[in-house]
Amino acid sequence: MLLYIILGLLILVGDQLLKGWIVANVSYGALHTVIPNILGLTYVQNDGAAWSMLAGQQWFFYIVTIIAVGVIGYLFYTSERSEKLYRIGLTLMLAGALGNFIDRLHLKYVVDMFQLEFINFPIFNVADTALTCGVICVFIAILLKEKVTHD
């Protein structure tokens, strides 16, 4: 259990520290190339979801996040200790959801900063990455579990 708590806290604290650094050191809207033609930093304030969908609908995001945190907590609590990949995925999802929730509560928007320069993709942050990786881990864990039960 301690591993999951440490992992979640590292992601959550890292997300918040990086967001604070971005706000203090990167000009709003300006692209700063990190890896040419691959990755840049662009500070944006996102009051919606990816591609600014549902912009300004903060109460929607509050409600969805509270429900998601409850469901993730329940799934973690009821999972088997041996389901490590599944639990890691849930931990990543929880840390990501809480990282963006903190922004929404404190700032009324989410600080995003990573911009992929080689594709038209929404600017995102550490919390978004944790959420995405968590969903992938949970999906793989479920597929692997189904494969074992069918064999």
UniProtKB/Swiss-Prot annotation:
This protein specifically catalyzes the removal of signal peptides from prolipoproteins. It is a multi-pass membrane protein. The lineage of its organism: Bacteria, Bacillati, Bacillota, Bacilli, Lactobacillales. GO terms for molecular function: aspartic-type endopeptidase activity. It is an enzyme of class 3 (hydrolase). Belongs to the peptidase A8 family. It catalyses: Release of signal peptides from bacterial membrane prolipoproteins. Hydrolyzes -Xaa-Yaa-Zaa-|-(S,diacylglyceryl)Cys-, in which Xaa is hydrophobic (preferably Leu), and Yaa (Ala or Ser) and Zaa (Gly or Ala) have small, neutral side chains. The active site is at D112, D128. The chain crosses the membrane at residues 3-23, 59-79, 85-107, 123-143. The gene is lspA. GO terms for biological process: proteolysis. Pathway: Protein modification; lipoprotein biosynthesis (signal peptide cleavage). This is Lipoprotein signal peptidase.
